[in-house]
Amino acid sequence: MSSDKSIQREESASFNEHSLSYIRQAAEYGLYEIRGMGAKRRVPSFDDLIFLSASASRYPLEGYREKCESKTVLGTRYAKQPIELGIPITIAGMSFGSLSANVKEALGQAATQMGTSTTTGDGGMTPEERESSKTLVYQCLPSRYGFNPNDLRKADAIEMVLGQGAKPGGGGMLLGQKVSPRVAQMRTLPEGIDQRSACRHPDWTGPDDLKIKIEELREITDWKIPVYVKMGATRVREDVKLAVKAGADVVVIDGMQGGTAATQQVFIEHTGIPTLAALPLAV
């Protein structure tokens, strides 16, 4: 029987309007979507945790007169000068380029006021960031953009980056509109051109080279400061074992909800696992 009413088609869970729009765009232009930030899908986060407070078996503290210790020490395994933080929360790496010099300086000031550390990110260290940060972690990434041994010696810790939660196994991207004259000079790149970062370190042939690179970084800094190893949360149990065996002081696990300046949409939404799922595998 025919009906005057138009047939209402329900949206498919697999091929909703957003997915169809993405497919049409890729078919028309032959390009995949590039965007920043983190996954839009709902994933378990630290906000989902529920704490067990004190009652009878655990005696409660009077917060206004009894202190709760939040000090965190990182790098006691091998470093001569471990990092001591006032809180167990740090600011992750965000590059100068994806962020302005003013923002990087502000992050350093905020971290200092809160008694914690901030991290350089891809593209190197700016003088403003070093001056404003009491505790600064210097990243060594596959791109080696802006990598400077002199700046390395100014850092309070080094973070060897193997991957990122928003794009594990994939390289980075800095859109040309953010490649200013200063960014181009620091990275030795042409101004205003989209730049891609490598997905793996150019002087490595396998996992065994991680140990060699960590030893090189320790020799450059006279074994004074901690060496972190950062990785995207994928094969967590195996990756953490390799990092520990290679001699890392600290292993950083970056879950899929971590943000990025720019990468493929499919990487952000469909690779890696959340931080909460990764932590039990890491320990």
What residues fall within each predicted segment?
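A cross-family glycoside hydrolase active-site/sugar-binding cleft signature
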Residues: 92, 121, 139, 159-163, ...
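Conserved, well-structured core domains of diverse proteins
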Residues: 1-89, 93-117, 124-125, 129-133, ...
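Flavin-dependent oxidoreductase catalytic cores
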Residues: 85-88, 102, 106-107, 116, ...
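Glycine-rich phosphate/ribose-binding loops and adjacent secondary-structure elements
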Residues: 201-283
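C-terminal helical cap(s) of enzyme catalytic domains, especially alpha/beta-barrels
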Residues: 129, 135-137, 176-183, 260-275
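Non-cysteine beta-strand/loop elements that form the S-adenosyl-L-methionine
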Residues: 158-163, 182-188, 252-256
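Internal alpha/beta core interface subdomains
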Residues: 4-17, 22-30, 44-46, 101, ...
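Conserved radical SAM core fold
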Residues: 98, 166-168, 189-197, 201, ...
